[in-house]
Amino acid sequence: MKTTIDMQVLYVTCTVLAALILGYIQAMIIYRLWFHPLSKYPGPWLARISNLYSAYYAWSGDLHIDMWRCHQKYGDFVRYAPNRLLVNTNTGLKAIYGFNKHVQKSTTYNVMVHRAPSSLTMTDPQESAQRRRIVGQGFSSTAINQYESIIMEHVQRLATQLVRRGSDRGSGWSAAQNMSDWGNHFSFDVISDIVFGARHETIGKPDNRYVLGCIDGANIRTSVLFQAAELTFGRVDRYLFPKSIESRNRFTPFVSSLVRTRLQSHDASRNDAFSLLVRAKDPETSEGLSMDAIGGECTTLVMAGSDITSTVIASTLFYLSTHTESYDRVKSELQQAFPTADDVRLGHRLNSCRYLRACIEESLRLSPPVGGAPWRRVVSDGLLVDGQSIPAGCDVGTSVYALHHNSAYFKAPFVFRPSRWLTDSGAQGRESRDIRLAQSAFAPFSIGPRSCLGKGMAYAELTLVLATLLSKYDMRAAEGPMRGIGGGRVGAPWGRHRENEFQLTGHVTSAKTGPYVEFKKS
């Protein structure tokens, strides 16, 4: 008898709880669809009620593509999550990421913090400004010039490896090379050397290449949590992403060992970034960085610094190998600037290679390494964007990929056209206006007080390696089945179908493959 009563009580209790939960979910859906402050903005219906919509596309690596698709369907303002709004205008870019006291980094950046926050993840504007004053000293013009010899050493090592194995045709051309892989190895070697003075030599040795896979693997989980931090409740993410956590647990000790080794060397005279961070003081407060803070900054530098450069190396070579006219113009420009490839160095002659720089800019526009929307939280009195009042407490952002392909700012937005960044002598005023308009919507390194600190070093590294390789070798796209790898595919989902567009899979950093190209000594 007692057992029967207990079962009845349990049944009633479960029924009531289920009804309450169901009622709560229904009320939440009704509120988010019709009464939420962002309810007037269009967007996918699932995105309007749940963060899981954007989390899914983050997991798939298609987040930037879907954001672009949504703008094509719904317009410049898209509700991309219950409490998040996408804005696809140049004025929105400036309002959200410029010097504006009404916004700060979203708390979703907390999912990226491990032990100590870095200049990338800090949400408080004052704390971030102080950290950037210190860390920025490691990326000043003076510091970059000190890193040049390190970069060039790895450039020469890469150049040697690219032609080490010839093709089967015996024509003087190398075997087809996957430039995503080579770019990853080169960029990781450079940033490890610059930050820690560590020589991993993944260009020539496979021993430490596993670290690159760990970075990509760990970032799958991070990219999902950046969209749906609630998946950390009850440690649900541990069950959803066991391989990502395994990758993180391999990568974190690797970086920690680099920090320990560098500290134990007791060599404060080195000019690597680690030494500069140890010595650097905030010019306003004279405060330095703790070891945990330095470790956090170094981890960010290794992950972000290697990814951006490797992605742009691959994308630029993809576009040049498929656009003969642009390739020939770059070759001619470099031949005029440098008698031999050994003469390539930072300075006036490299700066004069305007078409090379335009090719890099156009590759960054078409295939930005970070194509999603870095979310910002609206604070205080709200934010006014293009006449739209966005209330405090909401997240707002601009998809870099979507903005870079907005025809309001870029004519023929999916066409590789480096000349769009150049003003020829005697150009008319309209051409100059077109360039200014394009520049107003160009943000591969973001803009404003939270823009990328390593932008100057990235451009230095990119111009040095691309100028050297294109001066030293002739290059062509691989023939046969490897031709076109890296581009879109006819019949693929909308946004992935363009064969002439270098495709990226976005998981905080960018996974990619190709292009396959062949080299021959000039």
Curated annotation (Swiss-Prot):
It is found in: Membrane. It is a single-pass membrane protein. It is an enzyme of class 1 (oxidoreductase). This is Cytochrome P450 monooxygenase AKT7. Heme binds at residue 452. InterPro entries: Cyt_P450, Cyt_P450_CS, Cyt_P450_E_grp-I, Cyt_P450_sf, Cytochrome_P450_monoxygenase. Belongs to the cytochrome P450 family. The chain crosses the membrane at residues 10-30. Keywords: Heme, Iron, Membrane, Metal-binding, Monooxygenase, Oxidoreductase, Transmembrane, Transmembrane helix. Its cofactor is heme. Gene clusters encoding host-selective toxins (HSTs) are localized on conditionally dispensable chromosomes (CDCs), also called supernumerary chromosomes, where they are present in multiple copies. The CDCs are not essential for saprophytic growth but controls host-selective pathogenicity. GO terms for cellular component: membrane. The lineage of its organism: Eukaryota, Fungi, Dikarya, Ascomycota, Pezizomycotina. The gene is AKT7.
